[in-house]
Curated annotation (Swiss-Prot):
Predominant cellular place of this UniProt entry's protein: cytoplasm
Keyword terms: Chaperone, Cytoplasm, Nickel insertion
Transmembrane segments: none
Segments forming a coiled coil: none
Family: Belongs to the UreD family.
Listed HAMAP family: UreD
Subunit structure: UreD, UreF and UreG form a complex that acts as a GTP-hydrolysis-dependent molecular chaperone, activating the urease apoprotein by helping to assemble the nickel containing metallocenter of UreC. The UreE protein probably delivers the nickel.
The protein's name in its UniProt record: Urease accessory protein UreD
Length: 279
């Protein structure tokens, strides 16, 4: 039986004569994809758009991205993901499936999730990639939104991200937040901050020297957020950030992405031309 989604997007990218093109662009339901854009390097990028402004209780969404051999693309969200309250206790869900072929390169730069009062949300992402492929993947979650501007008024938030290389699970990260059962301000949770973001970079070009150089680069910036970088067992790293605002955290994420783009691929910094959203 075919799964029915409230919103579905399928993007496919191929390399044609040294230039990446979009060979597939499908959208249905509440999900839309922006018109074609290209950065200063000619890399195509697209915004994922939700026509309803946010996810309603019980809705299910699917994003599928395929990047073929030698292709390079960037996909981002137009705004943060707003998850509205779930009065009936139904779970709102989004699945993301990404496939990266030989020597492909995807930058998936999702804005953070903003869970509303009483919301319940599960986000699952699976990335299948060739060992020669390059990946930048970011997401995050905030303290949420309520009419009284009280933090952590949502019921349930779960985010599971898994990366496979040659069908072997090489990275698995899960965030589970249940503010009614957990003290969100204690050590190991938000620790007094309101925004959490993570960035995963996987590339055969990432080694211990690159990780140390990136750490030094970030330490040289005037940053408002706390962050930590860890090397992965494979050629890659994970960056975790806690900050006062999403804008502060995003500055670190884009600094890392720009450093990778310049040092590894000789590309100019990102300029996605979208309004920054504070929460």
């Amino acid at each position: 039986m075919t799964q029915v989604y409230d919103g579905f997007v399928h993007l496919g990218f191929s390399n044609r004569n040294g230039r990446t093109i979009s060979h597939k662009k499908y959208q249905e339901g509440n999900s839309r994809v922006s018109a074609d854009n290209s950065d200063a390097n000619g890399v195509p990028y697209y915004f994922l758009i939700n026509m309803g402004g946010g996810f309603v209780e019980g809705e299910q969404y699917q994003v599928t991205i395929d990047v073929n051999k030698d292709a390079h693309a960037l996909v981002t969200t137009q705004t943060p993901t707003y998850v509205y309250k779930c009065e009936k206790g139904q779970l709102t869900q989004q699945n993301t499936s990404i496939t990266l072929e030989e020597n492909s390169y995807l930058e998936y730069m999702a804005d953070e999730v903003i869970p509303y009062l009483k919301s319940r949300y599960f986000q699952k992402s699976r990335i299948d990639m060739d060992k020669s492929a390059h990946l930048i993947y970011s997401d995050g979650v905030t303290a949420g939104w309520s009419h009284e501007d009280l933090p952590f008024q949502y019921h349930y938030f779960r985010n599971l991200t898994q990366i496979y290389q040659d069908n072997e699970l090489v990275y698995s990260d899960q965030t589970l937040l249940e503010p009614e059962k957990q003290d969100m301000f204690k050590l190991g949770y938000f620790e007094g901050w309101r925004n959490y973001n993570s960035l995963v970079m996987v590339s055969p070009n990432i080694d211990e020297a690159f990780v140390k150089a990136l750490q030094k680069h970030l330490e040289g910036l005037n940053l408002e957020s706390d962050f930590a970088i860890s090397s992965l067992d494979i050629s890659g790293l994970v960056l975790r950030i806690l900050g006062k605002t999403a804008e502060d955290n995003r500055r670190i994420i884009y600094s890392c992405a720009d450093y990778f783009r310049q040092e590894i691929h000789g590309l100019t910094p990102l300029n996605l031309r979208k309004n920054d959203m504070r929460r």
